[in-house]
């Protein structure tokens, strides 16, 4: 018996076991409303790769099952999000969303990269406003508002030109402290920057839920709206779907796009209502564990 003949069954058994566990975990995450099971919904890209690998080595009678699972996962990952891009004679509003990471070691370099992207509006989470490396960026974008905090919940929305309004809204939760989001208005359109707490325990998961519910009510009341943020939730999560339904907004970030390291999850989102043709460009990874999203909004 050759090494190849012994290795394939050994690999097939282990991949099959892992694939069953992944399939069960993902199915439960879509059915049971519980913060811990919801965590398993975010890893669909990883499950899809696993199912495809299992289909390649599994025994004949199981191969079709994992091929179908991989195909279904791949279709969900590649399913078009939002409205198709359309050409327009009017110039687009360029907005940049970026969770810059509270401990970013190179704020000056990040500022230069953002200036090179030349957005009209920039919204940032986890920004350390005491870091002088952000001063050049703030000077170029003097209008807007921010929530100053020495925590991951610092938040800023800055604009090159005057905004009609900009305010920090504190979402009340049972976690012992409120969490901020920003609501601004420019040219009659509403801009929202969100960063709810991560669901790493039951208390913070409930806080995220309360935060998203309060933000959804504000967003639903607006007419034309652009929402951006690190939502600490993926497109495959029932929590994410509930939020988009309650707020009556459509996601535009591609389902397959990784925006957060080290797990390569898609948790930074752009969502809109009232305009078609929104385009998203993911910028190269810099010094944060997130990547910036450049939004062209007609």
Protein language model features and the residues they cover:
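N-terminal, active-site-proximal structural segment of metallo-dependent hydrolase catalytic domains
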Residues: 2-137
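Soluble catalytic domains of enzymes that build or remodel membrane lipids, polysaccharides, and related
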Residues: 95, 101-115, 126-298
């Amino acid at each position: 018996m050759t090494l190849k003949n012994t290795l394939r069954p050994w690999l097939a058994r282990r991949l099959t076991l892992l694939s069953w566990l992944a399939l069960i975990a993902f199915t439960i995450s879509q059915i049971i409303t519980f913060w811990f099971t919801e965590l398993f919904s975010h890893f669909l890209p990883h499950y899809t790769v696993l199912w495809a690998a299992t289909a390649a080595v599994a025994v004949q009678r199981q191969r079709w099952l994992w091929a179908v699972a991989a195909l279904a996962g791949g279709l969900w990952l590649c399913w078009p999000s939002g409205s198709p891009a359309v050409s327009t004679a009017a110039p687009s509003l360029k907005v940049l969303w970026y969770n810059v990471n509270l401990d970013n070691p190179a704020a000056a370099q990040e500022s230069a990269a953002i200036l090179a992207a030349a957005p009209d509006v920039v919204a940032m989470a986890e920004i350390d406003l005491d870091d002088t490396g952000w001063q050049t960026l703030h000077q170029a974008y003097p209008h807007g508002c921010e929530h100053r905090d020495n925590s991951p919940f610092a938040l800023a929305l800055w604009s090159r030109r005057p905004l009609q309004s900009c305010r920090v809204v504190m979402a009340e939760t049972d976690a012992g402290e409120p969490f901020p989001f920003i609501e601004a208005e420019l040219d009659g359109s509403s801009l929202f920057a969100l960063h709810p707490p991560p669901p790493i325990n039951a208390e913070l998961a409930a806080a995220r839920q309360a935060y998203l519910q309060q933000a959804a009510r504000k967003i639903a009341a607006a007419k034309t709206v652009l929402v951006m943020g690190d939502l600490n939730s993926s497109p495959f999560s029932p929590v994410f779907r509930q939020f988009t339904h309650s707020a009556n907004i459509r996601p535009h970030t591609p389902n397959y796009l990784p925006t957060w390291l080290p797990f390569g999850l898609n948790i930074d989102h752009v969502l809109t209502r009232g305009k078609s043709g929104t385009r998203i460009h993911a910028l190269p990874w810099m010094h944060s564990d997130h990547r910036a999203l450049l939004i062209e909004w007609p």
